[in-house]
């Protein structure tokens, strides 16, 4: 590549020093795209298609510069001209193509597939406004469209286009590609995003409301449109079918271009179904193969040998079940195929629990994936065992050979090199760079001789990252935080099973404790980040409580110097890259058995935070790796929780009556909080906790408070705390997504 200075002069007709940050960003965007364009596509005979409703890719400039090996040179050229790459990157808008862990995992995975030199593309939709932009106003979440698409972007319009048939009309798609360069190798893959030229943002009314019936104009406007009514559910089906029909046609076209006769399609393609949203790819592939003259039996056999399903949840609400009549209304041409798939299952298995179409005429997408795919994987060891022994036991009894575990991972290029360059460079200095390609080499930190020097440096790095976060929050939200406080952080989408409400009850405990004269050894800053689905009322209520507590504490001069609560507005990948390196206490407090894996826990661990968590998801594997003395575990285990559910034995009212719990829950509807908040919202959350509490907040609350208090006390022994930090960073290598993807390939995909 030519120098950046020459490129800027050629394209902007001025030097780097003379450019604004906006001009430099456009120049750098195109410079980076040009460098990526020079990489060859991976061209193995067999290709994985990772189909997902979400790809939470984050800003791409620095990430792509790192993978292309250009980051240090570009940073220096900018610096020599008096410019700062971080300030230039501020101009970039974060792509709004995902929401939570599902989408971030997909982004890490396509990065790792490329970096391992495997042939594989992500396939999804190009949402114009993503989920939504979160605005915190009047102590509540408000939603507005998240406009991220600009004329100059990472998207490259492809010449490919497909006809997608629906019941009453056909839509013509447009395909956009985003290059995914591998880390310091000569090849790349792509993220393929389908869209519609007819989509029209003018139909959006107030907030994120829009006409859900005008499919040609609304189809790719938003990720996860509100499905609390019939029209919203139908729109989800339109979206999902548009994604998989385009994906299936792309798969067949590319296989034919490589020489497939379609009878051998499984030699050319393997489809990884990421959660149940892309499940209709199975009947759609069967439809396309039979249309091309392949018999039904053979078409089913081909598709069964090329589709694999990743289960991401044991929450029944998230395992999609669509009314057959809705499918008949949207995609009637798929219904006979789905009915035939169900008929074959019924002919072989009498257990109603494994049928695809249930007695209420609902189509169970996960059931179709399991019967008509060759692999079913969970995403953490505990999660996979729960699937086999409980949630999907009826299927495991039929197909034990299909079930396997692939513990999730994260890309260290995004979450260490990019998010925490100070720590990354220090690890390079003392360990060398082997860990860039083999993350297990981080274990060498354990045997590094000068432990005192390492601890002193880790203290300095953490302090530096806290100041960086403080500046970020001041600039983006006008909030000032104390960089000398303990940073206690819970960042993830708002859901009752993730139990942000339990953390809020701890905040109440601490507030009342300080009011009673028990001053903590040092100030504590409790940081929350996450969005609540617009139709998820209780999740909105939890955000409201957190914001009310923030106001009550800030306005209390006896407490404010010692405790602060901050809800980070519009939490996204960019915010995470500031929050994670600055964190001391990583909150991973889901009800045991409910979190499939989690990946935030891995990012925090890698960046030197200690985990406060239940024995749930990947916390179990973190605990096994670091040892009980280097993690803070509380709460009931998954077996106990599952048993309580089966026997309907948990009564929140009994726990509410306890002396240690009642004052905390009552404080939600105290005069102080009601003065800051909405009575209806606060009373609804209060009643939910004492009368229902489906995710057993009060069951674990006392132990949570006890262990968290122990953690705060342990923090004051800096030497012992830093010993734990070193162990956590050293053992994080297992959670590299490169390791996860290598296992997917070895056990499932079998790519060259």
Task: Describe each region flagged by the PLM.
Residues 1-752:
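A conserved ligand/cofactor-binding region detector
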């Amino acid at each position: 590549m030519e120098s950046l200075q020459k490129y800027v002069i050629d394209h902007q007709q001025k030097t780097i020093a003379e450019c604004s940050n906006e001009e430099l960003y456009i120049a750098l965007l195109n410079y980076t795209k040009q460098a990526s364009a020079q990489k060859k596509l991976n061209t193995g005979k067999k290709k994985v298609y990772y189909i997902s409703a979400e790809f939470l890719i984050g800003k791409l400039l620095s990430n792509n510069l790192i993978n292309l090996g250009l980051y240090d040179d570009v940073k220096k050229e900018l610096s020599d001209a008096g410019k700062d790459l971080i300030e230039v990157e501020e101009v970039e808008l974060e792509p709004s193509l995902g929401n939570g862990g599902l989408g971030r995992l997909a982004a890490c995975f396509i990065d790792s597939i490329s970096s391992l030199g495997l042939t594989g593309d992500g396939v999804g939709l190009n949402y114009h406004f993503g989920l939504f932009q979160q605005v915190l106003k009047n102590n509540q979440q408000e939603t507005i469209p998240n406009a991220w698409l600009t004329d100059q972007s990472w998207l490259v319009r492809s010449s490919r286009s497909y006809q997608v048939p629906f019941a009453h009309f056909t839509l013509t798609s447009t395909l956009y590609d985003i290059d995914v360069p591998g880390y310091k190798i000569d090849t790349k893959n792509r993220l393929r995003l389908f869209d519609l030229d007819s989509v029209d943002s003018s139909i959006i009314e107030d907030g994120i409301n829009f006409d859900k019936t005008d499919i040609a104009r609304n189809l790719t406007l938003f990720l996860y449109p509100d499905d609390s009514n019939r029209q919203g559910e139908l729109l989800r089906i339109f979206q999902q079918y548009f994604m998989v029909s385009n994906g299936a046609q792309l798969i067949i076209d590319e296989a034919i271009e490589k020489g497939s006769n379609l009878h051998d399609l499984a030699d050319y393609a393997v489809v990884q179904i990421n959660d149940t949203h892309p499940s209709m790819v199975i009947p759609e592939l069967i439809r396309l193969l039979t249309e091309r003259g392949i018999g039904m039996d053979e078409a089913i056999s081909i598709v069964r040998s090329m589709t694999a399903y990743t289960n991401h949840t044991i929450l029944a609400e998230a395992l999609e079940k669509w009314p057959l009549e809705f499918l008949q209304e949207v995609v009637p041409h798929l219904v006979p195929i789905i009915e035939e798939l169900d008929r074959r299952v019924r002919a072989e298995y009498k257990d109603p629990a494994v049928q695809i179409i249930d007695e209420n005429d609902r189509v169970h997408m996960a059931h179709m994936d399991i019967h008509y795919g060759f692999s079913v994987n969970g995403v953490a060891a505990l999660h996979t065992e729960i699937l086999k022994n409980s949630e999907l036991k009826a299927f495991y009894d039929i197909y034990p050979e299909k079930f396997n575990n692939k513990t999730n991972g994260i890309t260290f290029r995004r979450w260490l090199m990019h998010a925490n360059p100070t720590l990354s460079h220090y690890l390079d200095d003392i360990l060398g760079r082997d860990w860039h390609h083999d993350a297990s080499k981080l274990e060498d930190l354990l045997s590094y001789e000068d432990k005192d020097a390492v601890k002193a440096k880790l203290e300095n790095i953490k302090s530096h990252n806290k100041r960086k976060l403080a500046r970020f929050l001041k600039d983006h939200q006008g909030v000032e935080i104390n960089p000398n406080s303990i940073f206690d952080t819970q960042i993830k989408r708002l859901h009752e099973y993730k139990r942000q409400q339990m953390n809020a009850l701890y905040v109440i405990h601490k507030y009342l404790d300080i009011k009673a004269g028990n001053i903590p050894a040092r100030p504590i800053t409790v940081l929350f980040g996450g969005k609540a689905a617009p139709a998820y009322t209780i999740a909105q209520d939890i955000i409201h409580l957190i914001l009310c507590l923030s106001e009550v504490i800030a306005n209390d001069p006896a407490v404010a110097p010692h405790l602060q609560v901050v809800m980070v507005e519009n939490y996204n990948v960019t915010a995470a890259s500031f929050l994670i390196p600055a964190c001391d206490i990583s909150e991973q407090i889901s009800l045991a058995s409910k979190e499939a894996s989690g990946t935030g826990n891995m990012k925090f661990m890698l960046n030197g935070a200690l985990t406060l968590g239940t024995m749930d998801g990947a916390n179990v594997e973190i605990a096994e790796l670091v040892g009980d003395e280097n993690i803070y575990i509380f709460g009931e285990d998954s077996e106990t929780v599952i048993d309580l559910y089966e026997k309907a034995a948990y009564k929140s009212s009994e726990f509410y009556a306890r002396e240690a719990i009642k004052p905390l829950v009552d404080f939600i509807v105290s005069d102080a909080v009601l003065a800051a908040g909405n009575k209806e919202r606060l009373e609804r959350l209060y009643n939910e906790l004492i009368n229902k509490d489906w995710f057993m907040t009060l069951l674990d609350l006392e132990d949570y408070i006890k262990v968290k208090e122990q953690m705060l006390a342990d923090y004051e022994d800096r030497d012992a705390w830093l010993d734990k930090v070193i162990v956590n960073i050293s053992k994080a290598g297992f959670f590299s997504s490169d390791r996860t993807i290598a296992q997917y390939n070895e056990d499932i995909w079998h790519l060259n």
